[in-house]
Amino acid sequence: MRVRACLAVLLISSAAAAPAAEPRLVLLGGGRAPEAALARFVQWAGGPRARILVLPWGGEDAREGFQAVKDALRPFAPGVVETAPPVPLRDDGRVELRRRLERATGVFLAGGDQQRLLDAFADDVVAAAVRARYRDGAAVAASSAGTAAVSSLAITGEGDFTVIDARQVAVRAGLGLLPGVILDQHFLKRQRENRLFALVIGHPRLLGVGIDEGAALLVRGDRHAEAVGGQVMAVDGSHRGELRVYLLNPGETFDLEKRKRGRAAERTPGR
């Protein structure tokens, strides 16, 4: 127990050594990722000097999942793309994860099975280390199940989605990288509106964001968001007795904090 506590301190403190940068997220809805979104991720991570750490823990074959991400990023020429140690992690694996995280300028949460990925992040030491590295300035990209895991309240994929009832939508604790937002993916393609509507009604303080297959949402500073490559839906349940639904087309922006659209000509800062 004492060893785990010490490792948690090491993982968090080592990631916090450098000055904090504005948080940057590239959230992919699954399927074929928009090239513009992958290019932005590599740019945010440092371009040719980028060192990307892939967490392929949601897939049945972690090596195959890692290779798929590496192949997708290759056209954008990051400096290094490496994989995380396999889960479940023991003490030596956590130390190795710390070593790879502290030198990473970008972290990629690959897709797969949401439950399997959330099982990996149920290790508090691992989850805290990823959060700390993100808050310390590493760009984070996530795809499919990885996108769902970014939420504080993460959709597991299980439940009865024929009704709009939050009690029928299974959720677990996620990473919480994007405060106040619950994320869904493969959204319009797989007709997942019911489960997101249900969770927003059940948790009106959370903004629901559904990212369609082939689309992405670029987010800076936990707030400034831009749809890329396809459609993104934002669902606001904070107004008593009604849901406000916003459909964002590629290039359109949204303020996640104010829960309002940006102007069509605006773009996410720091392009």
Predicted regions and their residues:
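Bacterial N-terminal signal peptides that target proteins for export
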Residues: 1-7
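Hydrophobic h-region of N-terminal signal peptides that target proteins for export
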Residues: 10-19
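C-terminal and late-domain segments of enzyme folds
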Residues: 20-49, 59, 63-75, 154-156, ...
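Structural motif
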Residues: 27, 106-110, 141, 184
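Portal/gating segments that form or line small-molecule/metal binding sites
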Residues: 59-103, 109
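Catalytic-core regions built around general acid/base machinery
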Residues: 100-103, 123-137
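Catalytic nucleophile loop
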Residues: 109-111, 130-154
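Glycine/threonine-rich flexible loop motifs
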Residues: 114-124
